[in-house]
A protein has these predicted regions:
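Transmembrane helical cores of multi-pass ion-transport proteins
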Residues: 1-434
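Active-site-adjacent beta-strand anchor residues
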Residues: 76, 131, 487, 518-519, ...
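Generic hydrophobic alpha-helical segments
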Residues: 86, 166, 470-474, 550, ...
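Short, contiguous clusters of charged residues that form electrostatic/catalytic patches at enzyme active sites
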Residues: 28, 188, 192, 468, ...
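Short acidic-hydrophobic, aromatic-tinged amphipathic segments that line or gate anion-handling sites
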Residues: 537-553
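Short beta-to-alpha loop/turn elements within the nucleotide-binding domains of ABC transporters
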Residues: 115, 497, 545
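The feature marks cytosolic C-terminal regulatory regions of anion transporters and related permeases
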Residues: 367-537, 555-563
Length: 564
C-alpha cells in the first residue's frame, strides 16, 4: 500500500486564491454562520446538552474540518443524525462518557483515512443508509413531541426507547399546552413558506426571529407566561469553556467502543455523502481520505472544549455553495461568525421558545426522512427491501448501533449470496467452441476433449461459497474422469476457502488416481496459489497458461495411462 497522502484543499487552493474569491467567501461564510446558529442550538438541546455546546461544536469542529478537510466547500458541525446517539450515550454514560466516545470515534476516523478506507465507506449499501436515516428522522420527530405539545410529565422521567416514550406521552396527553402547539405550527408554517419568497434566507432563521420576537411581546404585554423558552430550562454561558480532557479507563473504553464505531461510521457516511453532493454541484472532486482524517481530528478536539460529535452537514454545505462559497475560507469564516455570536449575542438566545426549536427539528426530521426515496426502494428486489425495513425498524425500536451492525451483517450476507449466484461453473466433456474463446493458440481439431477428460470452466471469484458449488457439481456427474482440467482464466481472485477447496480436491483426486490440471490462471491468483504452497502439491508441470496447453498435457497423460 502506498503511503497516505494528506492534502487539505485549503493549502492546495491558496496558490491561486484571489481577492474576488476572498470577497465571495467572506459573504458566504457570514451567511452560513447565521444559518448554522439555530440548527446548532436545536441540535444541542435535542441531544440532551446545553445550547452553547451545539454552537461550540460548530465553531471548533467546523473550523478544523474547513482548515484540514478534503473538500473545497464542506461545512462541518453538529447534525440531526447524531441526536439519537448522543442522547442515548448521555443517559447511559453521562457527559464524560460522550466525550470519551467522541474522541474514540475521532481516532477511528483518522485511521479510516490513513488506511485509505474513504472509498470503501461509499460502498455501504444504499438501503442501509436510507433505512437508518429514515429511522433517525422518526426518532427525532418522536423526541420533539413533548415540546410541540408542551406536555407536563409531573416529574416522571421520559425513557430513551421509542415505545417507552410514546407510552409516557399517551399517559400525559391531557396536559397539552395549546399555546406551545400553536407556536410549533406557526414555526413550521414559516419555515415551509420562506423558500417561496427567498431561496437564500433559511426558513429556520426567519421562524426563530419572528416567533421569538412575537412571544417576547406576548409575554411582556399580553400576560402570557405559559410558553417555555430556552432561558426557562438552561443557563446560557456566553464563553468558550476551558479545555478539559476526560478521565480514561480501560473499562469505559471497552463499554464505549461499539458506540464509538457507530459515531465514526455515521460521521464518515454523512460527511462523504455531503462532500459527494457538493462535488456534483461545483464540478470538483473531494479527497475522501483527507476528509476523514479532518473529521477525525475535529471529533477528537471538539469534546476537549465541550463539543459533541460533528460531521459534514449537507444543508449548510449547500447554503455555502448557493451563496458563492469557493474555498475552505468560507467555512473558517462561518466558524468565526459563530464564535462572535457566542461571545456577544448568546444571551439573546434565552428568549427563543422551545416549541419553535421543536418546529425547526420537525422540518429537519421531515427532510431527513427521504420518504419518497424510502417508498421507491420498497419496489426494489426483496433482498434490498428486507435490509431497508430491518435497518429502519431496528433504528427506531432499538438504537442506531444495533441497526448499523445488523444491517451491515445482512448486507454482507446478501452481497456474498449475489456473488455466489453470479459466479458460474460449467462442465465441458466433448469439445470447446473456438469462436467463443480468446486464449486459443492452435486450430480447431485440437479443441476436442479426449475421452476421460472433463473441463471445468469457472467464471467469477473463487471463494467459500463457490467451493461448495464446485463440490456439488462434481458429485452430480457420477462417473469419475481420468483427468480434470480446471479452467480459471475468468477467476479474478481466490480466498483461503477456495485454496482449501482446491487442495482438498487435489488430494482426493490423487487418492482416486484422477489427474488435476489448472489452465489460464491470471497473475494475481497465480501469486496467491504459489505463496500458499498449492503448486508444490499439484506439481508445476500441471499448471498451464491456456486451454490448448492443458489439453495437450491431458492427451499425453491419457496415452501414458492407457499404456499402463
Amino acid at each position: 500500500m502506498k503511503g497516505f497522502d494528506f492534502r487539505p484543499k485549503l493549502f492546495t487552493m491558496l496558490r491561486s486564491y484571489t481577492k474576488a474569491d476572498l470577497t465571495t467567501d467572506l459573504m458566504a461564510g457570514i451567511i452560513v454562520g447565521i444559518v448554522a446558529l439555530p440548527l446548532a442550538i436545536a441540535f444541542g438541546i435535542a441531544s440532551g446538552v446545553s445550547p452553547e455546546k451545539g454552537i461550540i461544536t460548530a465553531i471548533v469542529a467546523g473550523f478544523i474540518i474547513s482548515l484540514l478537510g478534503g473538500s473545497k466547500v464542506q461545512i462541518g458541525g453538529p447534525t440531526g443524525a447524531f441526536i439519537v446517539i448522543i442522547y442515548g450515550i448521555i443517559q447511559q454514560y453521562g457527559i464524560e462518557g460522550l466525550m470519551v466516545a467522541t474522541m474514540m470515534a475521532g481516532v477511528l476516523l483518522i485511521l479510516l483515512g490513513i488506511f485509505k478506507l474513504g472509498t470503501v465507506i461509499k460502498f455501504i449499501p444504499y438501503p442501509i443508509i436510507i433505512g437508518f436515516t429514515s429511522g433517525i428522522a422518526v426518532t427525532i420527530f418522536t423526541t420533539q413531541i413533548a415540546d410541540i405539545f408542551g406536555l407536563d410529565f409531573q416529574g416522571e422521567k421520559v425513557p430513551g426507547d421509542f415505545i417507552g416514550k410514546w407510552l409516557v406521552y399517551a399517559r400525559h396527553f391531557d396536559s397539552v399546552n395549546w399555546w406551545n402547539f400553536l407556536v410549533s405550527i406557526i414555526s413550521i408554517f414559516i419555515i415551509a413558506i420562506t423558500p417561496k419568497f427567498s431561496k437564500k434566507i433559511p426558513g429556520s432563521l426567519v421562524a426563530i426571529i419572528l416567533v421569538t420576537v412575537g412571544i417576547y411581546l406576548l409575554k411582556m404585554y399580553g400576560g402570557i407566561t405559559c410558553i417555555d423558552t430556552i432561558g426557562d430550562r438552561f443557563s446560557i454561558k456566553a464563553q468558550l469553556p476551558d479545555a478539559a480532557v476526560p478521565a480514561l479507563d480501560w473499562e469505559a473504553i471497552k463499554n464505549l467502543f461499539p458506540v464509538a464505531i457507530t459515531i465514526a461510521v455515521l460521521g464518515a457516511i454523512e460527511s462523504l455523502l455531503s462532500a459527494a453532493v457538493a462535488d456534483g454541484v461545483i464540478g470538483d472532486r473531494h479527497d475522501s481520505n483527507t476528509e476523514l482524517v479532518a473529521q477525525g481530528i475535529a471529533n477528537f478536539v471538539s469534546p476537549i472544549f465541550g463539543g459533541i460529535p460533528a460531521t459534514g452537514a449537507i444543508a449548510r454545505t449547500m447554503t455555502n455553495i448557493n451563496n458563492g462559497g469557493r474555498s475552505p475560507i468560507a467555512g473558517i469564516v462561518h466558524a468565526i461568525v459563530l464564535l462572535l455570536i457566542l461571545l456577544f449575542l448568546m444571551p439573546l438566545a434565552k428568549y427563543i421558545p422551545m416549541a419553535c426549536l421543536a418546529g425547526v427539528l420537525v422540518i429537519v426530521s421531515y427532510n431527513m426522512s427521504g420518504w419518497r426515496v424510502f417508498k421507491g426502494l420498497l419496489k426494489n428486489p426483496k433482498a434490498d427491501v428486507v435490509v431497508l425495513l430491518i435497518t429502519f425498524f431496528l433504528t427506531v425500536i432499538f438504537d442506531l448501533t444495533v441497526a448499523i451492525e445488523v444491517g451491515l451483517v445482512i448486507a454482507c450476507v446478501l452481497f456474498m449470496k449475489r456473488v455466489m449466484e453470479t459466479t458460474q461453473i460449467s462442465v465441458i466433456t466433448d469439445e470447446i467452441d473456438p469462436n467463443k474463446e480468446s486464449d486459443l493458440e492452435v486450430h480447431e481439431e485440437h479443441l476436442i476433449i479426449p475421452n476421460g477428460v472433463e473441463v471445468y470452466e469457472i467464471n467469477g471469484p473463487y471463494f467459500f461459497g463457490i467451493a461448495t458449488k464446485f463440490e456439488e457439481i462434481m458429485a452430480s456427474l457420477g462417473d469419475r474422469p481420468k483427468i480434470r482440467i480446471i479452467r480459471m482464466r475468468k477467476v479474478p481472485f481466490i480466498d483461503s476457502t477456495g485454496i482449501h477447496n482446491l487442495t482438498t480436491l487435489c488430494e482426493m483426486s490423487q487418492k482416486e488416481n484422477i489427474h488435476i490440471i489448472l489452465s489460464g490462471v491470471n497473475p494475481q491468483v497465480h501469486n496467491v496459489l504459489e505463496k500458499s504452497g498449492f503448486y508444490e502439491l499439484l506439481g508445476k508441470e500441471n499448471i498451464c497458461s491456456n486451454i490448448n496447453e492443458a489439453l495437450e498435457v491431458a492427451r499425453r497423460e491419457i496415452v501414458e495411462l492407457n499404456k499402463n
